């Protein structure tokens, strides 16, 4: 096969922003997907906090990927889309079942915390009025904010964003960069 990306060496520190800039097709998205573990590099290492994650599943890398296509669940409301990563992370297998989960005492306090985290992110992104809607009822910019929120709510070690602010109004773009 043909090599798409050569000689990439990134060292990013806490609180630092790094932007990959280049023409369409030069490998920016592929680089992000390799870091996230969604694609495998043919050589070299991907390390996070000095630890190689080459053999680490994407779900265990503590990274949040925001795709240009949003990747929202169309059958879920905005609230449910925001809650999904927290439910997967914080609830046990049995607590995730709607009927059975309600019988488990530990589920209630976890769900209260999940709701708080969703509320904080929805306020930050100004999407509270959208929480009961489904993605198909939203504009492109609104969907993008929901996708950002789903990444933010997890509070990951790092965000990998593939053109995350491209569909937003200039004032909201500035607000989110500051956040």
Where are these regions (language model features)?
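The feature captures the beta-strand-to-loop junction immediately N-terminal to the Walker
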Residues: 21-23
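Helix-to-loop junction immediately C-terminal to a conserved catalytic motif
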Residues: 36
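Conserved ABC ATPase "signature" region
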Residues: 52-54, 83, 87-129
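Hydrophobic anchor residue at the start of the ABC signature
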Residues: 148
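A short, proline-enriched helix->beta-strand linker immediately N-terminal to the Walker B motif
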Residues: 153-157
């Amino acid at each position: 096969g043909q090599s798409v990306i050569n000689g990439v060496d990134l060292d990013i520190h806490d609180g630092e922003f790094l932007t990959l800039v280049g023409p369409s097709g030069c490998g920016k998205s592929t680089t992000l997907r390799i870091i996230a573990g969604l694609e495998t590099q043919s050589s070299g290492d991907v390390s996070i906090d000095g630890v190689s994650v080459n053999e680490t599943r994407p779900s265990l890398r503590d990274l949040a990927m925001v795709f240009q296509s949003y990747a929202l669940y169309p059958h879920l409301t905005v609230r449910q889309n925001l809650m999904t990563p927290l439910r997967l992370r914080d609830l046990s297998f049995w607590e995730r079942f709607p009927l059975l989960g309600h019988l488990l005492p530990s589920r209630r306090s976890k769900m209260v915390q999940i709701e708080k985290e969703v509320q904080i992110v929805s306020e930050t992104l100004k999407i509270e009025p959208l929480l009961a809607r489904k993605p198909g009822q939203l504009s492109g910019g609104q969907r993008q904010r929901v996708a950002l929120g789903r990444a933010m709510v997890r509070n990951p070690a790092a965000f990998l964003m593939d053109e995350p602010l491209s569909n937003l109004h200039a004032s909201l773009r500035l607000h989110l960069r500051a956040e």
